[in-house]
Every structure is written in C-alpha cells, then in structure tokens.
C-alpha cells in the first residue's frame, strides 16, 4: 500500500521506530522530527532506531521538509497512494513497515506538536523495553497540541 518509499540510509532493521503520521505538515514536521532524533540519540544510544514519516500523499512538500531536517538518527518516508487518506491508513503502513524492520517497539507522535521534547521519546519508549506492551501519555499540554488526542 506504499505509493512511495524513500529510505536514504538503506535501513532494513530497527528495534525502535518513531513514527510521525502526516498530511500537509511541511511547515511543522521539522520540529517533532528533531526532538525525536534528540530523544533517540540521548536515551536509546545502543538501540537501532529510525524515524518514519507515514504520510498521506501530501501536496505541500512534507516529504522534502521531513527528509531535509537534520537528524542524528536515520529517517524513512512512506506514503499512501493519491486519494488514500486518514490516520488509519498511515498506521496500517506504519505497522507493515515496522514488521518488515523487525521493530520491538513503536512510538508515535504528531507532526504538528510544538511542546514535544526529547524526554517524550524516553517516557513513551522506555516502558516498551521493560515488559510493558502499551504506553499512553498523561501530561499537561499546550491548548493547541490537542491533535495528538483528537486524531
């Protein structure tokens, strides 16, 4: 179901995947991408990881904005075909790719978050490597970051 897949680093295995679902988020995707990279580098240095942008065939250069964001962690872009939209389709692609990569854990953050910090990656990812199967955040958030819960 991938219309497009861009894998500049040739990643074929990753224990930890951070996914950023998107649709027309070129203006905002860089910040959560940078924060995810910092979190992975700082808190999971010994674990193979990748940041995947699961996109809905955005027309606003989301792909380029994501891939051009400087990170220490490899990135991968996958997209649905034209006309196939919705976060559910992004998640379907994410689970398919994470399975192909042999991922042991997946962390998902939204593309338009402004309050995300590297610690989010730590707090969402660490329990998954300590016998927890699911982690949901409980936090005070900025009033405009509601899209993480209003998908």
Predicted regions and their residues:
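Short, well-formed alpha-helical segments that are part of the catalytic scaffolds
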Residues: 2-7, 25-41
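Short beta-strand-to-loop acidic/aromatic patch adjacent to the donor-nucleotide binding site
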Residues: 102-114
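Conserved acidic residues
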Residues: 49, 104, 133
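Alpha-helix termini
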Residues: 7-8, 37-47, 70-74, 97-102
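Short, acidic/glycine-rich phosphate-metal binding loop used to engage nucleotide
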Residues: 57, 80-87
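Acceptor/aglycone-binding surface of glycosyltransferases and processive sugar-polymer synthases
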Residues: 83, 89-93, 97-98, 116-151
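Cell-envelope/extracellular polymer assembly enzymes that use nucleotide-activated donors
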Residues: 15-17, 50
């Amino acid at each position: 179901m991938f219309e497009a897949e861009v894998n500049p680093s040739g990643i074929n295995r990753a224990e930890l995947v951070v996914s950023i679902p998107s649709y027309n988020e070129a203006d905002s995707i860089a910040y959560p991408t940078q924060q995810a990279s910092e979190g992975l580098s700082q808190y999971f240095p010994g674990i193979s990881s990748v940041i995947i942008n699961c996109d809905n065939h955005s027309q606003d250069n989301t792909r380029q904005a994501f891939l051009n964001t400087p990170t220490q962690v490899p990135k991968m872009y996958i997209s649905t075909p034209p006309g196939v939209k919705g976060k559910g389709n992004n998640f379907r692609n994410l689970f398919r790719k994470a399975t192909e990569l042999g991922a042991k854990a997946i962390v998902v953050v939204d593309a338009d978050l402004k309050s995300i910090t590297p610690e989010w990656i730590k707090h969402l990812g660490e329990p998954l490597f300590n016998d927890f199967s699911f982690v949901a955040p409980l936090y005070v958030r900025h009033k405009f970051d509601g899209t993480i819960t209003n998908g």
